[in-house]
Amino acid sequence: MLEFNATESRSQPSRRDFLNLAIASSLGTIAPIWDSHEARAAGSAAVPLKLGLVTYQWGKDLSLVDLLDVCKRTHYAGVELRSTHRHGIEPSMNAAQRSEAKKRFADSPVALVGLGSACEYHAVSPSVVEKNIDETKAFIDLSAELGGSGVKVRPNGLPSEVPVEKTLEQIGKSLQIVGRYAAKANQQIRLEVHGKGTQEIPNMKRIMEVADHPNVVVCWNCNPTDLIGPGFDANFDALAPWLGTVHIHDLRPGKVDYPWPALFKKLKASEAKGFTGWCLMEDGATPPDIPAAMLENHSVFESLSS
């Protein structure tokens, strides 16, 4: 069990957070309440796949105005705004800045898919975990205010001095707290498959089993580790019930060695209730002509998703 020495408030986690969550779960009172047009309802048709951009690295140097313009011109329907980039969308924004950003998205055909935080919950120190939970809540509030539908978070490693299972449970219980908070704001918590050790599929599955909240979903990250052990199909299927969003990489031939046709076959058949359909371009290699690369990827995406 995590130990927090915080007073109870809307932004502070406590032991009672865990207790109340356990009670609510046992009574069946927790339900997904994010926008129904982005989540799959039981028995509905497959969710259409949509191409968006993560500002890492292709959009990190663009202002919000330029970012929306480039996405519009290259037919990217949405954007996940990674924290600390030039767009300036941060929890520290004042009311006027938030109002302006909200209007920018309202006036654009490009949707705010959500915010990409670096919040993580694996630290040995409870105070550090608590700080990350508080930061996550601030990102949730901002995403909801600006019209987004979720916040990306991540696991980021397994401290060597702590048993692996204990760290996985700590991450999962922290996700329960932020997932419960996100539900009140119609937001998802999107856990990126990330981090040394934590990105291994059995560990991610364990984290999600502990989290056990409908507003906590997986952001499939298209990692090389997806292909180890039992292979892509089995690894994807292990996390498929929790699928929410996808971070894809450069789809052009010869760029990234990944089974893209197999992935898109899985995505088109997804029955995950939290799957939004968003496939978000995130690639660490910066092409010399980013808009041209985006257009070329859009063409490949259309072929793979049809």
What are these regions (language model features)?
Residues 80, 114-116, 152, 247, ...:
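Conserved beta-strand positions in the central sheet of alpha/beta enzyme cores
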Residues 65-72, 95-107, 137-145, 233-237, ...:
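Short amphipathic alpha-helices and their capping/turn segments at secondary-structure boundaries
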Residues 57-59, 83-85, 119-121, 155-159, ...:
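Active-site-proximal loop/turn and secondary-structure-junction residues that shape catalytic pockets
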Residues 17, 22-32, 43-45, 68, ...:
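Active-site acidic/histidine proton-transfer and metal-coordination neighborhood
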Residues 67-84, 147:
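Catalytic domains of carbohydrate-active enzymes, especially glycoside hydrolases
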Residues 77, 111, 149, 276-277:
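Short acidic/polar active-site loop segments enriched in Thr and Asp
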Residues 82-102, 156-162:
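Glycine-rich, proline-tolerant flexible connector loops at the mouths of alpha/beta enzymes
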Residues 2-52, 61-75, 198-306:
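Histidine-acidic metal/acid-base catalytic patches
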